[in-house]
Structures are given as structure tokens and as C-alpha cells.
């Protein structure tokens, strides 16, 4: 005889409106004795089984035809391990009862999660294969403090929200449940009765794998093993290291020619990685690989921050790709988007019926430029979710650096907003103080937890101290994209050479602020889309002049202080804009040797020469590493400077940005002796006119530009040359 269960409780449980299933289901000590209760829709017969002997201990009575069973076990007083023999559609199945297991999340973890100080929340939240009390299965947990009820639905329960309602840990707002038999590879979601009584089906914010779009389910997947960064990888990120970044969109670098389908992670490991190594790049930067529903977002509107996109393969395939890059001596940078997320119903938006991850006021929580939602960084659990994600990619995949997207949109409340469309901070200012603190905290934790890992900021304003320590008012990034340099130099290069003399300062201005931050010089994906034209097509003149201008510009860029970044396709001067739905124009490199081969060879030589000579990279962020030799010859559009290493070795860089060769061009130098031309962008090897200095030039004891010794050079048309001192 079972104890009396309130009919309203049974109805609420079956209807999915009951918040505390563990208070009813499972094994309970009652006045009637030891009682077992189970909600098993469509079952016709249920027995309690003792696992050791397989003996039937007692039969459960069907109290409701919709699947509620209950029974008192005779001669049993103490709790024990049990299983249920359940008959469905005439077939008996032996199952473990999810409601016989105790709380899953340890009190310390729950406290840290609530405080927002759990360094690795992904180790607790989400779906994790586990063995409990000798039973294999998966433990699920999700943060949804305002939901009235949360269930796990998936392939293991016919996507039926009645079958696996979860336990609420009220102190943290986390719902949890261990489901015996649920295993890796199975799909799942969370079904929530939200704060307003509406039903929502949500993907797991902490899912390690997800379905291929347009499907949106999460996939049970084990946590990857930790990756220990090698000493070589750590050194490759240092300020004095040569850093030349090849920025890549994995879906359009190259495609299968027969069906225009993407290459897989493993195919990219076999093709992209050796190509980048051959080209001499030191780093691969990947446009976001987090799962995202819309191809046209390029990954910048992610819905699965913890899941590599299935477009190119599995999570393990992605790890294979990263391992291949590391084996080839390439560090991997991941574009990371902690600034906003899309409003898709299956994702984070109004997760539990409230504005849980985003701000409730659209003046704070809605990004009108991208039709996305903005994270509420002031909510500890939200910041914890994001900080944990940064560590996840670095520790579990071996990502060497994160490039943080759209930092300006995060740190300014009035970003892209008119007056009246934004809310000031507590001091009446425009800064988003919570976002600033989040970025500082993220960078601090990266520095403490992942030796050698770094972060880079795409920050488009003049916010002071992006790469300075937080204790001095900075954001704590290691590097910042120099978007000002990029805009100024491209504006200069697109001018007809006749008019460049009037805009000389666009090339010199960058040095006035160059040492305020640790800069990366970016020619990124943003510069070859939306009608901006390709980098090649921005160059003025006929075809010969376009290619000559581009080569001269690359020679200038690779010698200028700052780390280098080049988006794919620019290394061989693709003529059209980037199209994310198609392969790069590799056909331009087919057939006989041409101008595109010339640019490709130049970029390869730039990379290898840049890496070989410390003067070109060792003191990028030290004033001693750079000195103007000729800065004011605007009439002839000539600029000459010195790069210097710690030992004082110099490389001279001279650029002529007109199509007129400058013969007998004399300028003063610091170190007399024999100088060799080690790179000339006008060389015949790059399909230039082959004007130059015949290899070696000797200095003269003739005063020039305030220096006792000087060189007399021929400066090729629309070209940059590099010279290295060989001796006295």
C-alpha cells in the first residue's frame, strides 16, 4: 500500500509544471514504508529490481494511466541500489532510475559559480559523461534561475520533457540531473518552462559539440584532454618574436572544385597548414569557428561558444587541425566574440524567460548595427561563462592567442548610438565599466593560467592603454590592431602618385603614436568586402602600376614597426573582393608565371627575411628599434628609415612611392660600410622592372641629412628596398 500522493502533484508532474521532481520521484521513506515512485509515460508494468541478484523486490502500482507508478517495498527499511524493470509496448527494459542519485554539483563549485569566480565552469556545467554508483551515464546541468521547470530532452527519451525533469539547486539557480545510459554522440537540448509559463527549447550554452546548421541540438561529447603549450609556442608569442599572421576563413580558403563544398578540418590540416608554413607565416588566425547558424556572419554571431562548428567536421577533427599547425611550427589565433550574440530562439536570448545573459533595456542590451544582443557583463555568471570560454579554447584545444572582436563596441555604451539611445554609467560617463572590468579580468586570468598565451584587441578608437596593465588603467591586452595605420596607409596608396606628395603625413603620422600600444598591422578580411575592393584593386594606375604599388606597400608594411597580419588571398594579389561562399581565386596561379606569382613570391620572401633578421622584429615596441633617415622628402614621395635590433645591427628601408626612378639618391646613415640589398620589391623575380643597386653599395664619407656618412642609391619606381650592413 503506497502513501497518498496529492493528485495535483501528479497532474503537475505529468504536465511538466512541477519544479521539484526529486521530492516526489525516486525512493522515499514514508509512513507506509520504503516507497519508490516513477514517472514513466507509456509504460504498462514496472518492477523494482535488486541489481546484485536480479531479484524482483516489488511491483509498482500504476496510479495514473499517463505513467505515474508508485509502490511500497515489503520488508525493506534502508535505502539501497535498485533498478526498474519497465515494460513498454510489450517489451521489458531494465533501467536505472535517475531519481535515486543525490546532488551532482559540489557545494564549492556551486558557490564559485554563483560568485562568478569558477575559473573553469565548463568542467561542471553542460553535459559530462560520468559513472555514478557504478552506473554509466551523463550528468547534465544548466543555469536557469528563473525557470519554473527544466527537463533534459534528447534521443535517449524521445525528446519528451515529461521524462527527465531536473533538480533545482536554489542557492545557484542551476538545474542538474544524471541520466543513466545517455552517452557520447547523442543529441539533447533543455526544455524550460520559463518564468512566464512559456515553453522554451534551448541548446546547451556549454555544449562541446552541436548539430550542423540548420539543426540546432547539442551533442553529448567528452571534455577534451588538456594541452600543454610547448616552450617554442610560448616564445613565438613574445613581443620580440617575429609574428606574421595569415588570417583565414576556413570555409572559403579553398573548396572542392566538383561541388564547391568546404574542405574538412583534416583536409585543411593537409593543405592549408603546409601552405602557410611554406609561405613563411608564423601564425594562423582563424575567423570564428564557434558554432553559428548563419554562414553570412562569417562566425561573428556565434550561438555555441564552446562548440567548434560542424561545418568542417567534429571536435576531434578540429583538434587534429590545431595539432597539425603546431607540428608545422605555426601558432594558432582564434577570433573570439564575447561582445554580442544573435537573438535566435534556441540560443541564449531570454534563456529562462528573463533577460538572463543580456541586458533587459535595449539601450544597453541590443546592438542595432548587427541585430544582436549584448552580454550583461555586470552579471557574475555571464562574465564567468565568457572568461571560462577563453580558458577552454586555450587549455583544451591549445589555442595560442585570442583576437577579441569589436572591443570598442564593448567598452563604450554609446557605440554607434545617437543621443538618447544609450544609458550612461553610474558616474554619468560613456564607458561600459562592467565590460572594461570583464576584459581586464579575462586578460589577467589568461596571463596567470596559460603560460605564453596572449590576447589581441580589435579596438577602433583611441582608448588609452589597451595593451597596458590594468593596474595602470589599461585593459591588459598583449597586442592591439593598428586600425589607424591601416586606414592612413591604404588611403595614401590609393592616391595617384602625383598627389601623394600632398598626403605624405599619412605614412609618417603612425610613428607619432606607435609606441603608445603594442601594435599589429592588419590587412584583414574587413578590408576586402562590402564594396571596399581588394587590396590590389585599390592601387592606382594600369595593371603594372597596381602590382608595383602593392609590392611597394607590402615591403613598407613588413619593415614598419609592429607585427604583421594579412588576410588570405592578399598574399597572391587576388583581384576581386572576398566571397565567403566561394574559394579563393587559386586559378590566378595556374598556367605560366605571372604577376600574381610575383606577389606570392614577394610575400614569402618578406616573411622569411623578416623572420631571419632580428632588426625587423626584436624592438617593435621600443623607440630604439626605429629611426627616420629621410622623413620630409614629400616632393619625391621618398621615405627612408632604419630598423635596429638590441645589438645595434641596422637594416635600412627605402621606399619610392612614385613611378619615377630616383637615381643618385643620397641620404645620411648611422653606420658606414658595405651595405647589401637584401630585398627589392621591383626585382624581376617579382615581375618588377629590375631596377636596383646591383647587390652591394659602399657608403661615402659625405655628409648628408646631418650625418657624417651617406649612401648614394638608385630607388626603383614604386618600390621598397631593404639593405643590410655586411661590414666596414
Curated annotation (Swiss-Prot):
InterPro entries, A to Z: A-amylase/branching_C (IPR006048), Branching_enzy (IPR037439), GlgB (IPR006407), GlgB_N (IPR054169), GlgB_N_E_set_prok (IPR044143), Glyco_hydro_13_cat_dom (IPR006047), Glyco_hydro_13_N (IPR004193), Glyco_hydro_b (IPR013780)
Q: What class of enzyme is it?
A: transferase
Would you name any one GO CC term? Answer: cytosol
- Provide the GO biological process annotations: glycogen biosynthetic process
Q: Which residues does UniProt mark as catalytic?
A: 405 (nucleophile), 458 (proton donor)
What molecular function terms (GO) are annotated for this protein? 1,4-alpha-glucan branching enzyme activity; cation binding; hydrolase activity, hydrolyzing O-glycosyl compounds
Q: Which UniProt keywords apply?
A: Carbohydrate metabolism, Glycogen biosynthesis, Glycogen metabolism, Glycosyltransferase, Transferase
Instruction: Write the Enzyme Commission number(s) for this entry.
Output: 2.4.1.18
What this chain does, per the entry, is described as: Catalyzes the formation of the alpha-1,6-glucosidic linkages in glycogen by scission of a 1,4-alpha-linked oligosaccharide from growing alpha-1,4-glucan chains and the subsequent attachment of the oligosaccharide to the alpha-1,6 position.
Relate the assembly described in the record: Monomer.
The identity of this protein, by name, is 1,4-alpha-glucan branching enzyme GlgB
Amino acid at each position: 500500500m503506497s502513501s497518498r500522493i496529492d493528485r495535483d502533484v501528479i497532474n503537475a508532474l505529468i504536465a511538466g509544471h512541477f519544479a521539484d521532481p526529486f521530492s516526489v520521484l525516486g525512493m522515499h521513506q514514508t509512513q507506509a514504508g520504503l516507497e519508490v515512485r516513477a514517472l514513466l509515460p507509456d509504460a504498462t508494468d514496472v518492477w523494482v529490481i535488486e541489481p546484485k541478484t536480479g531479484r524482483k523486490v516489488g511491483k509498482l502500482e500504476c496510479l495514473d494511466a499517463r505513467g505515474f507508478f508508485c509502490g511500497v517495498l515489503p520488508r525493506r527499511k534502508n535505502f539501497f541500489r535498485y533498478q526498474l524493470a519497465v515494460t513498454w509496448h510489450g517489451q521489458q527494459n531494465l533501467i536505472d532510475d535517475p531519481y535515486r542519485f543525490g546532488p551532482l554539483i559540489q557545494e564549492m563549485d556551486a558557490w564559485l559559480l554563483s560568485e562568478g569566480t569558477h575559473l573553469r565552469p565548463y568542467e561542471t556545467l553542460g553535459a559530462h559523461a560520468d559513472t555514478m554508483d557504478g552506473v554509466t551515464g551523463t550528468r547534465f546541468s544548466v543555469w536557469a534561475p528563473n525557470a519554473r521547470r527544466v527537463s533534459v530532452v534528447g534521443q535517449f527519451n524521445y525528446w519528451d520533457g515529461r521524462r527527465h525533469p531536473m533538480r533545482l539547486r536554489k542557492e545557484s539557480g542551476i538545474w542538474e540531473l544524471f541520466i543513466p545510459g545517455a552517452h557520447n554522440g547523442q543529441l539533447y537540448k533543455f526544455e524550460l518552462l520559463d518564468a512566464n509559463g512559456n515553453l522554451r527549447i534551448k541548446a546547451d550554452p556549454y555544449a562541446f559539440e552541436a548539430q550542423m546548421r540548420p539543426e540546432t541540438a547539442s551533442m553529448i561529447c567528452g571534455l577534451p584532454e588538456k594541452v600543454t603549450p610547448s616552450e617554442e609556442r610560448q616564445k613565438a608569442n613574445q613581443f620580440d618574436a617575429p609574428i606574421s599572421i595569415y588570417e583565414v576563413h576556413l570555409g572559403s580558403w579553398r573548396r572542392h572544385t566538383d561541388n564547391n563544398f568546404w574542405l574538412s578540418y583534416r583536409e585543411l590540416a593537409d593543405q592549408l597548414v603546409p601552405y602557410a608554413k611554406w609561405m613563411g607565416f608564423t601564425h594562423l588566425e582563424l575567423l570564428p569557428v564557434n558554432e553559428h547558424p548563419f554562414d553570412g556572419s562569417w562566425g561573428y554571431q556565434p550561438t555555441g561558444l564552446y562548440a567548434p562548428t560542424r561545418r568542417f567536421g567534429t571536435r576531434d577533427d578540429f583538434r587534429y587541425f590545431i595539432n597539425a599547425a603546431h607540428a608545422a611550427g605555426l601558432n594558432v589565433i582564434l577570433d573570439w566574440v564575447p561582445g554580442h550574440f544573435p537573438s535566435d530562439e534556441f540560443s541564449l536570448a531570454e534563456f529562462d524567460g528573463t533577460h538572463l545573459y543580456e541586458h533587459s533595456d535595449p539601450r544597453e542590451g541590443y546592438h542595432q548595427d548587427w541585430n544582436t544582443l549584448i552580454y550583461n557583463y555586470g552579471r557574475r555568471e555571464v562574465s564567468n561563462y565568457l572568461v571560462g570560454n577563453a580558458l577552454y579554447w586555450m587549455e583544451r584545444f591549445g589555442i595560442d592567442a585570442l583576437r577579441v572582436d569589436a572591443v570598442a563596441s564593448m567598452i563604450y555604451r554609446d557605440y554607434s548610438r545617437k543621443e538618447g539611445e544609450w544609458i550612461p554609467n553610474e558616474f554619468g560617463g560613456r564607458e561600459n565599466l562592467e565590460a572594461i572590468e570583464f576584459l581586464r579580468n579575462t586578460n589577467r586570468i589568461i596571463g596567470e593560467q596559460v603560460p605564453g598565451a596572449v590576447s589581441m584587441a580589435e579596438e577602433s578608437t583611441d582608448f588609452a592603454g589597451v595593451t597596458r596593465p590594468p593596474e595602470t588603467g589599461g585593459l591588459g591586452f598583449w597586442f592591439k590592431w593598428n586600425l589607424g595605420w591601416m586606414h592612413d596607409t591604404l588611403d595614401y596608396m590609393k592616391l595617384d602618385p602625383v598627389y601623394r606628395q600632398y598626403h605624405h603625413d599619412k605614412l609618417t603620422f603612425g610613428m607619432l603614436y606607435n609606441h603608445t600600444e603594442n601594435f599589429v598591422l592588419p590587412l584583414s578580411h574587413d578590408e576586402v568586402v562590402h564594396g571596399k575592393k581588394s587590396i590590389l584593386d585599390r592601387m592606382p594606375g594600369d595593371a603594372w602600376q597596381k602590382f608595383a604599388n602593392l609590392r611597394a606597400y607590402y615591403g613598407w608594411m613588413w619593415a614598419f614597426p609592429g607585427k604583421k597580419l594579412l588576410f588570405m588571398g592578399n598574399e597572391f594579389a587576388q583581384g576581386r573582393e572576398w566571397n565567403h561562399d566561394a574559394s579563393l581565386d587559386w586559378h590566378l596561379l595556374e598556367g605560366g608565371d605571372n604577376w600574381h606569382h610575383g606577389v606570392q613570391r614577394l610575400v614569402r620572401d618578406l616573411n622569411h627575411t623578416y623572420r631571419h633578421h632580428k632588426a625587423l622584429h626584436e624592438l617593435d615596441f621600443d623607440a630604439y628599434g626605429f629611426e627616420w633617415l629621410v622623413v620630409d622628402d614629400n616632393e619625391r614621395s621618398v621615405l627612408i628609415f632604419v630598423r635596429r635590433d638590441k645589438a645595434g645591427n641596422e637594416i635600412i628601408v627605402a621606399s619610392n612611392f612614385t613611378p619615377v626612378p630616383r637615381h643618385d639618391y643620397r641620404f645620411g646613415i648611422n653606420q658606414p660600410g658595405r651595405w647589401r640589398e637584401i630585398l627589392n620589391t621591383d626585382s624581376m623575380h617579382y615581375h618588377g622592372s629590375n631596377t636596383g643597386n646591383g647587390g652591394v653599395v659602399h657608403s661615402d664619407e659625405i655628409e648628408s641629412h646631418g650625418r657624417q656618412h651617406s649612401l648614394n642609391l638608385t630607388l626603383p619606381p614604386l618600390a621598397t628596398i631593404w639593405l643590410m650592413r655586411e661590414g666596414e
